[in-house]
A protein has these predicted regions:
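Conserved phosphoryl-transfer catalytic core
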Residues: 1-30, 48-49
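Short, acidic loop-to-helix structural element flanking the phosphoryl-transfer center
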Residues: 51-83
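Substrate-recognition "cap/lid" segment bordering the active-site pocket of phosphatases
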Residues: 59, 82, 87-139, 145-154
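Glycine-rich phosphate-binding loop signature in dinucleotide/nucleotide-binding domains
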Residues: 74-79, 130-136, 191-194
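Short acidic-hydrophobic, aromatic-tinged amphipathic segments that line or gate anion-handling sites
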Residues: 111, 176-181
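Acidic, Mg2+-coordinating phosphoryl-transfer loop and its flanking beta/alpha structural elements
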Residues: 140-178
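Short amphipathic alpha-helix with an adjacent loop that forms part of the alpha/beta core around
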Residues: 185-197
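Compositionally biased, intrinsically disordered low-complexity segments enriched in Pro/Arg/Gln/His
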Residues: 196-202, 209-211
Length: 213
C-alpha cells in the first residue's frame, strides 16, 4: 500500500509495539508517511494477520501459562487478569482466541499497541481501564527485557518467564524470574499479601528481595 519494494529489514521486534515495528519497517523500505497514513497501515496489518495466522495457535502457548491463568481466574477476589501487549488490539484478541485463552481476559480491559506506540505507557493505561487499579497490587508478567522496562516505567512489580526467547540471566532485572509459568503462583500469592500492607514498590523505596526461582 506504500508502493515500496519488499525487503528483509533488520528491525527488532521482541517486546515492542506493532506501531513502532511498522514505522521502522516502512522507514527502512524508504517510506516517510507512515504516521499520516497510520489508519490504513493498521487496517492492512490486521487484515494480513487474519489471513496469514494459523487457525490453531494453542501449541504456541508457553508451558504453564494455561495452568497459571486457570489458577488465577479461580481467585477473582484476589487477582484480576488484564492483557498487556504491544499488538494492535484486534490482532491481540485474534491471537488469544486462536490460542484458546481469550476467555481469561475481559473485553475493554488491558493495554495494547493500539493505545500507544510506546510500551512504557501501557501499564498505566491498563490500570486506568481497571478503575484506577493501584500500583502496589499490579504485576506485569512478561518474557522480554522490554516487559521489565515497561513495568519499571509505571513503578509496578514485574515477573519474568524465560519462555526461550530470552534466558533467565537476560531477565534478571525482574523482581522474580522463573522458567515455567506455574512457578509464579506462589510468588504472586506472596506479593498479594504484601500488597495489603503499607509496604510498596514505589520509586525510592527499598525493593523486596527476589523470591527464589
Amino acid at each position: 500500500m506504500h508502493g515500496l519494494a519488499p525487503l528483509e529489514a533488520d528491525v527488532e521486534v521482541a517486546g515492542r509495539t506493532d506501531p513502532a515495528i511498522m514505522r521502522d519497517l516502512v522507514t527502512a523500505a524508504g517510506g516517510a508517511d507512515v504516521d499520516a497514513r497510520w489508519p490504513e497501515v493498521a487496517e492492512a496489518a490486521i487484515a494480513a494477520y487474519e489471513q496469514l495466522a494459523p487457525d490453531d495457535l494453542s501449541e504456541r502457548v508457553a508451558p504453564g501459562i494455561v495452568e497459571l491463568l486457570e489458577a488465577l481466574a479461580e481467585r477473582p477476589a484476589e487477582f484480576r487478569l488484564a492483557l498487556l501487549t504491544g499488538n494492535l488490539e484486534p490482532i491481540a484478541r485474534l491471537k488469544l482466541a486462536r490460542a484458546a485463552i481469550g476467555h481469561y481476559f475481559e473485553p475493554e480491559q488491558g493495554g495494547y499497541g493500539s493505545d500507544h506506540h510506546d510500551r512504557a505507557e501501557l501499564p498505566a493505561i491498563a490500570r486506568e481501564r481497571a478503575g484506577g487499579w493501584p500500583r502496589e497490587r499490579t504485576v506485569v508478567i512478561g518474557d522480554t527485557p522490554r516487559d521489565i522496562a515497561c513495568a519499571r516505567a509505571d513503578d509496578v512489580r514485574v515477573a519474568a518467564v524465560a519462555t526461550g526467547l530470552f534466558s533467565v540471566e537476560q531477565l534478571a532485572d525482574a523482581d522474580a524470574v522463573v522458567d515455567d509459568a506455574r512457578a509464579l503462583l506462589p510468588v504472586l500469592h506472596s506479593w498479594h499479601s504484601w500488597g495489603q500492607s503499607p509496604l510498596g514498590t514505589r520509586r525510592g523505596s527499598q525493593r523486596r528481595p527476589k523470591p527464589q526461582t
